[in-house]
């Protein structure tokens, strides 16, 4: 810049000596050196025209005007008789822009910053701007602790006054904090204060938040944390006097010194509220109540201000101002808080608009709204609409924007901006275990059918042991009040023996219809009716199965496997869901509780009841919700009525990707104990362990799972940011470390009758596993990978360390 001023000054001086003060009439204007810039464009930028009388000041203005276009790096104005001769040197045109050595800053971000400064391909090159960019980038590296970093712009000339621009980065290494000193602290130790910092001079291995790499922004955040720490404990006159950041000679070490004045502790003596309270003084006063003698607390003061704003926001005052001014009395060490409130204007909603819903119909989104058009703006109602859209599970993100209507003092438009995700999935599952080998499963599910909000599923399984098909449809808004209607039909041909379960075949089909009744924003009750026909055959005699048949008045021979039995059952189905998750998929905060159950009704062959309770709670441990603790439980119980038992084919099972990972699906819990209907079969069957009595085969233990009428499963997960994933895909990929445990038991098992066999009525036989899981919302649907190692198991359990599913998340 200084060179430019010197050049202009020298030109002005030379012009003065050439032209003199008397001026002359310009008869013609000629340019020399123009290449890219048209003559007409150059003439338009000049204040001098043909026929004008010009003097030294006009020439100076002409030079300044041509420089101001940004097209020239040198301008000279000469007189040739009555002709004005303008000699220019155009700035070169940027032909290409490349980067080298930048690891901390992505190319796209650099291009955006360059374009914001006017540096882009096809534009002229301003070397002064380049110098500013170099300095700005180096300042950025300094702010993140890389003090040895350098950025150089390399300009390579090309034909036709073009150049290649290359930014060469030498990022260096981040300076590490050697020591943090706090001077002036008496009430709290330095270790206690630093323990709340992100920046540390020592970071234990278990601390995933602390960092020894210096960053200016993090230091500013830590200083604010320090200030809040004192203000929250009554130190109303706390002050950070100064902060020194010292660099070691090799620029690899940082010493930080923070000088503070603690002051004394102060107690609140009272709160006085004044201003325009919009008629809500009583409610506001409730928010400002304090306990006598309570210590001054800065965080509580801020929360009080926010609560007042939220209160007024619920009544349509969209832009209230709340300011708290502490009046400190040093004599008695008290603080009186004066709160000034200006509610401002009450705003009404003109329109509610939706953006980004290319697939979902407006009506699907609009029916989730609690804010009405024409009513006053309620911030809580707008937020409820956002929560409900998130819980639909149709969108990756939902954002709200309140836009004032131009020309109106009291109207706004509420805009919901959504980013849709794939709501259809092709469900395909693969599992591999040391004992189970490979297993497959498939199906199709669409949660937002043609953008209507209907859920439609066509699921099927075909493998060595099962042929299953199901068609399900749910209309979440069967009535305008939000009553849902769902139904399904299914067919199942199940060969339990081939699934490593107890030996039997069950061919079943049925249907059910369910109504859902919303109670409030978070609770829904469900009720419905169902019918199922079960046709049992090839039942190999085993204790739990024969016990059930006996309760049904059936006493087949234990010496024959060719037994058959069929039932027709009608059920009353019920359920309750409490859902306060922050979004429908990949939640980060909130709780979901789901209770489902059924009980047979008159006209049924069986008489039993069955219920399952699922819970999931997400607790974020950071403000960005990237680190989350997830706790899950599942409890199930069922039993017979009127002296009958619950059918064995309705038993609960555990093991697999949705319960206890690391175990093969459905293999945790009681195992079949067979009657020796044909002893010679067992001699060649390694799965059976038959006892003998008086030289004859007695009962035979096996590894075939039979499930139980009671189940308990729990899981603790630590959800973490996925490494090596860009921010663009952060909302689509989830990584977690987990600890699963679970057990299944049979409350009707008589351990005294079967001494010498495992006590399958004992609920304390808990299995445990630990591992890592990766979930990805892919274009095909949710993909789930998990690897788990069982570390507590029992005889007969079957491990399946690696499991992979498409279409299943939790």
UniProtKB/Swiss-Prot annotation:
Residues 24-91, 92-172, 175-263, 266-344, 347-421 form the POTRA domain. Part of the Bam complex, which is composed of the outer membrane protein BamA, and four lipoproteins BamB, BamC, BamD and BamE. GO terms for biological process: Gram-negative-bacterium-type cell outer membrane assembly; protein insertion into membrane. Coiled coil: none annotated. PANTHER family: OUTER MEMBRANE PROTEIN ASSEMBLY FACTOR BAMA, SORTING AND ASSEMBLY MACHINERY SAMM50 PROTEIN FAMILY MEMBER. This is Outer membrane protein assembly factor BamA. Pfam families: Omp85, POTRA. One of its GO terms (cellular component) is Bam protein complex. The gene is bamA. Part of the outer membrane protein assembly complex, which is involved in assembly and insertion of beta-barrel proteins into the outer membrane. Constitutes, with BamD, the core component of the assembly machinery. InterPro entries: Bac_surfAg_D15, BamA/TamA_POTRA, D15-like, OM_assembly_BamA, POTRA. It is found in: Cell outer membrane. Residues 1-20 form the signal peptide. It comes from Salmonella newport (strain SL254).
């Amino acid at each position: 810049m200084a060179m430019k001023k010197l050049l202009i000054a020298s030109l002005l001086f030379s012009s003065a000596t050439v032209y003199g003060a008397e001026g002359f009439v310009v008869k013609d204007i000629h340019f020399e050196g123009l290449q890219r810039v048209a003559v007409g464009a150059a003439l338009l930028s000049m204040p001098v025209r043909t026929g004008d009388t010009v003097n030294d000041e006009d020439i100076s203005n002409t030079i300044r005007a041509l420089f101001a276009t940004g097209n020239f790096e040198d301008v000279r104005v000469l007189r040739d008789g009555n002709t004005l001769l303008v000699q220019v040197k155009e700035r070169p045109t940027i032909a290409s822009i490349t980067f080298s050595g930048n690891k901390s800053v992505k190319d796209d971000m650099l291009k955006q910053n360059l374009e914001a400064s006017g540096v882009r391909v096809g534009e002229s090159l301003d070397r002064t701007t380049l110098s500013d960019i170099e300095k700005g980038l180096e300042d950025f590296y300094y702010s993140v602790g890389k003090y040895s970093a350098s950025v150089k712009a390399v300009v390579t000339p090309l034909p036709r006054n073009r150049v290649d621009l290359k930014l060469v980065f030498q990022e260096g290494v981040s300076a590490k904090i050697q020591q943090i000193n706090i001077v002036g602290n008496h009430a709290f130790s330095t270790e206690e204060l630093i323990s709340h910092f992100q920046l540390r001079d020592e970071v234990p291995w278990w601390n995933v938040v602390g960092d020894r790499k210096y960053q200016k922004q993090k230091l500013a955040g830590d200083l604010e944390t320090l200030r809040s720490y004192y203000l929250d404990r009554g130190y109303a006159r706390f002050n950070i006097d100064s902060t020194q950041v010292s660099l070691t000679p090799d620029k690899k070490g940082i010493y930080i010194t923070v000088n503070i004045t603690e002051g004394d502790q102060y107690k609140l003596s009272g709160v006085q509220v004044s201003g325009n309270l919009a008629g809500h003084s009583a409610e506001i006063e409730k928010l400002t109540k304090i306990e006598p003698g309570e210590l001054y607390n800065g965080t509580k003061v801020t929360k009080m201000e926010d609560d007042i704003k939220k209160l007024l926001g619920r009544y349509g005052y969209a832009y209230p101002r709340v300011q708290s001014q502490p009046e400190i009395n040093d004599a008695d060490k008290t603080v009186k808080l004066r709160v000034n409130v200006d509610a401002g204007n009450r705003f009404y909603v003109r329109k509610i608009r939706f953006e980004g819903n290319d697939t979902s119909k407006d009506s699907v989104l609009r029916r989730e709204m609690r804010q009405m058009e024409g009513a006053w703006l309620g911030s809580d109602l707008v937020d409820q609409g956002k929560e409900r859209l998130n819980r639909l599970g149709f969108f990756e993100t939902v954002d709200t924007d309140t836009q004032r209507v131009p020309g109106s003092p009291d109207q706004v438009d509420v805009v919901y901006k959504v980013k849709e995700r794939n709501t259809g999935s092709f469900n395909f599952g693969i599992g591999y275990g040391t004992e189970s080998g490979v297993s497959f499963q498939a199906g199709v599910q669409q949660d937002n059918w043609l953008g209507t909000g209907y859920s439609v599923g066509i699921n099927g399984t075909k493998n060595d042991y099962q042929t299953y098909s199901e068609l399900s449809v749910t209309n979440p808004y069967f009535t305008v009040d939000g009553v849902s209607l769902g139904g399904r039909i299914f067919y199942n041909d199940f060969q339990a023996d081939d699934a490593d379960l107890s030996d039997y075949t069950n061919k079943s089909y049925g249907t059910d219809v369910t109504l859902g009744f919303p109670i409030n924003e978070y609770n829904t009750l469900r009720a419905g009716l169902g019918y199922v026909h079960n046709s049992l055959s090839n039942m190999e005699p085993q204790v739990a199965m024969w016990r059930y048949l006996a309760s049904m008045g059936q006493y087949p021979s234990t010496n024959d496997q060719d037994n058959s039995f069929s039932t027709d059952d009608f059920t009353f189905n019920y359920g309750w869901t409490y859902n306060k998750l922050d979004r429908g998929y990949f939640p980060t905060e909130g709780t979901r509780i789901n209770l489902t159950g059924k009980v047979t009704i008159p006209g049924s062959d069986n008489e039993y009841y069955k219920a399952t309770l699922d819970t999931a709670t997400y607790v974020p441990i950071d403000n960005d919700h990237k680190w989350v603790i997830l706790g899950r439980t599942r409890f199930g119980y069922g039993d017979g009525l009127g002296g009958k038992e619950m059918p064995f084919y309705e038993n609960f099972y555990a093991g697999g990707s949705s319960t206890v990972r690391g175990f093969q699906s459905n293999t945790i819990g009681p195992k079949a104990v067979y009657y020796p209907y044909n002893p010679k079969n067992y001699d060649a069957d390694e799965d059976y362990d038959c006892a003998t009595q008086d030289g004859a085969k007695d009962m035979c233990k096996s590894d075939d799972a039979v499930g139980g009428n009671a189940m308990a499963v729990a899981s603790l997960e630590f959800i973490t940011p996925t490494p090596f994933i860009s921010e663009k895909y952060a909302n689509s990929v989830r990584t977690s470390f987990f600890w699963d445990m679970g057990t299944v038991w049979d409350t009707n098992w008589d351990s005294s009758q079967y001494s010498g066999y495992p006590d399958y009525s004992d609920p304390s036989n808990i299995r445990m596993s630990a591992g890592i899981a990766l979930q990805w919302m892919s274009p095909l649907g949710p993909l789930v990978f998990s690897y788990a190692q069982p570390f507590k198991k029992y005889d007969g359990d079957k491990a399946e360390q690696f499991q992979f599913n498409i279409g299943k998340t939790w």
